[in-house]
């Protein structure tokens, strides 16, 4: 029984496999269709689907039209219109009621504010506040009158008059700022230099300690020391190729070593300025440049003020400027330009000028100027425009003369070179 069932199952499987292979062979042996025929069949099928869709939409529109014309739909629409009109009327009535209530409340509040009790309470509060303020002022008055408080008040700044990014003021304001700056910072050499006492003429010479005398005696009398000195002299003066090569190599190594650990040019410049004025400070000098020196010199340069320029400029740049102004004077014109703004005042580099190793600061800054020239006799404008603003870049070289530290105007600062590097129209 079991064996017969298994045979029947296997027979069915074989029959199914035969049918599958027959179908595959038939489908593979079928004639292929052309692309045009496939396209036409697909087009007809899509057209038929489109026609069926149009018929369905038309039927839906007909049913919608009949629905809108039915009695039930009309009753629902009338009920909606009545409900909306009722809501509008209720909201209008509510708005009017609230407005009337607000007006009444406002009038009551105004009457209450102007009533006698409230006015009395306002007077009491005001007098109490004045009493408290007066008490605080009286209590803090001894503190505010101390020297420490005044010093802190003068030192602190809110940054509104900061000259770090841009600064330009008229001549009177610059002088006031300069006086305040000198008093506050005490940066000038007159406060740090030790004046010589001409009344004292005697000189006290201190003798060397005894151990130094003994060292000098050993150097002069020791044979070993003399031998070492002779060998050193022979090494330095020898012309032997090997000794000369060794000496050159040693000199190059010592040169590299000295360059690695020697002073930079900037540090040498700072040391020289410190030797001239021990109280010198770079930040204070930059502030002094921005607030006084640069505006003073630049304004004189643009307006043609020779007296101010002669005070600050050295002989070479002043001669160049004077030659230029003489050409203007020959044509009977004078400069009446003006400075609008000064920005970017900064020390670009520090240098030692040869051959005397003069320490200098190279300072650059930008200005906004108006250049105009008028006739010296009639005062008529002959060149330039009042609304033509130019942005100019300046380069200047500053040094300090020790013999002029007591000059109340320059404090020893002198401009070695001053030139306008570039000028372009701002507008």
Curated annotation (Swiss-Prot):
InterPro entries: NTF2-like_dom_sf (IPR032710), Tim44 (IPR017303), Tim44-like (IPR039544), Tim44-like_dom (IPR007379). GO terms for biological process: protein import into mitochondrial matrix. It comes from Schizosaccharomyces pombe (strain 972 / ATCC 24843) (Fission yeast). GO terms for molecular function: ATP binding; ATP hydrolysis activity; protein-folding chaperone binding. It comes from the Eukaryota. This is Mitochondrial import inner membrane translocase subunit tim44. Heterodimer with pam18. Component of the PAM complex, at least composed of mtHsp70, mge1, tim44, pam16, pam17 and pam18. The complex interacts with the tim23 component of the PAM complex. GO terms for cellular component: mitochondrial inner membrane; PAM complex, Tim23 associated import motor. It is a peripheral membrane protein. It is found in: Mitochondrion inner membrane. Its main location: mitochondrion. Coiled coil: none annotated. Keywords: ATP-binding, Membrane, Mitochondrion, Mitochondrion inner membrane, Nucleotide-binding, Protein transport, Transit peptide, Translocation, Transport. The keyword Nucleotidyltransferase does not apply. Belongs to the Tim44 family. ATP binds at residues 90-97.
């Amino acid at each position: 029984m079991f064996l017969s069932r298994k045979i029947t199952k296997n027979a069915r499987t074989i029959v199914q496999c035969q049918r599958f292979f027959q179908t595959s062979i038939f489908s593979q042996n079928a004639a292929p269709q052309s692309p045009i025929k496939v396209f036409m069949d697909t087009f007809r099928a899509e057209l038929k689907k489109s026609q069926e869709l149009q018929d369905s939409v038309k039927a839906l529109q007909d049913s919608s039209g009949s629905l809108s014309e039915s009695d039930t739909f009309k009753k629902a629409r009338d009920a909606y219109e009545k409900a909306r009109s009722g809501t509008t009327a209720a909201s209008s009535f509510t708005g009017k009621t609230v407005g009337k209530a607000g007006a009444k409340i406002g009038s009551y509040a105004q009457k209450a504010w102007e009533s006698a009790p409230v006015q009395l309470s306002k007077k009491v509060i005001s007098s109490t506040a004045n009493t408290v303020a007066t008490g605080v002022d009286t209590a803090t008055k001894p503190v505010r009158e101390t020297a420490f408080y005044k010093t802190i008040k003068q030192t602190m700044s809110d940054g509104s008059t900061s000259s770090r990014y841009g600064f330009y003021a008229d001549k009177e304001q610059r002088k006031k700022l300069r006086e305040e700056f000198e008093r506050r910072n005490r940066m000038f050499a007159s406060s740090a230099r030790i004046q010589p006492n001409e009344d004292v003429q005697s000189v006290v010479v201190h003798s060397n300690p005894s151990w130094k005398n003994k060292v000098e005696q050993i150097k002069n009398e020791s044979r070993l020391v003399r031998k070492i000195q002779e060998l050193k002299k022979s090494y330095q003066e020898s012309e032997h190729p090997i000794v000369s090569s060794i000496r050159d190599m040693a000199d190059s190594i010592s040169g590299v070593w000295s360059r690695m650990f020697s002073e930079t040019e900037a540090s040498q410049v700072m040391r020289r300025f410190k030797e001239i004025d021990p109280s010198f400070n770079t930040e204070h000098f930059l502030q002094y440049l921005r607030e006084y020196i640069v505006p003073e010199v630049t304004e004189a340069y643009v307006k043609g003020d020779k007296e101010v320029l002669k005070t600050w400029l050295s002989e070479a740049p002043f001669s160049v400027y004077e030659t230029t102004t003489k050409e203007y004077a020959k044509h009977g014109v004078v400069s009446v330009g003006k400075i609008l703004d000064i920005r970017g005042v900064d020390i670009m580099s520090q240098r030692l000028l040869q051959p005397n190793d003069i320490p200098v600061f190279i300072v650059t800054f930008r200005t906004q100027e108006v250049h105009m020239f008028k006739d010296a006799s009639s005062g008529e404008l002959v060149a330039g425009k009042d609304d033509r603003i130019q942005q100019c870049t300046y380069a200047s070289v500053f040094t300090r003369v020790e013999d002029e530290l007591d000059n109340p105007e320059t404090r020893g600062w002198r401009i070695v070179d001053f030139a306008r590097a570039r000028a372009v129209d701002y507008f």
